[in-house]
């Protein structure tokens, strides 16, 4: 039997690194600063996340008594989850950030009207990390402009490819 080359191992490790993405956040908000936060999880939640049963699309983060919590994110428990713990799918989960980061985020949220939106859930070595972004909501005309720009970029690439192929 032959061993897999090192490239394949590295490629597969990065492919399984991302657990869940919030693509809707890019559509609904102008994302500005991004932060990496740890999550305070229970054992059954980590097992469920390993099985790919996490959803952060409906989630958001808010500041309560100087700490940041993730609200509305769903981690569906496994059937064979621990019997001595009653799993709650949408409980508030504490985000672990440095005090300076919390203070910076707190001032931007309170004074400038930003929202904290989860954008990605991923593994960093053996720990689950959440990427949160400071965001401002888009108006409907902003969404239309973004769609037009995206379509224009796609058409431009198509024309350039066709031109380069014919040349």
Curated annotation (Swiss-Prot):
Composition-biased stretches (Basic and acidic residues): 139-158
What family, per the record?
Belongs to the SmpB family.
Q: Which PANTHER family does the entry mention? A: SSRA-BINDING PROTEIN, TMRNA-BINDING COMPONENT OF TRANS-TRANSLATION TAGGING COMPLEX
Which Pfam families does UniProt cross-reference here? SmpB
- Superkingdom field: Bacteria
Q: What is this protein called?
A: SsrA-binding protein
Q: Give the primary localization class.
A: cytoplasm
Organism of origin: Xanthomonas campestris pv. campestris (strain ATCC 33913 / DSM 3586 / NCPPB 528 / LMG 568 / P 25)
Task: State the compartments where it is located.
Answer: Cytoplasm
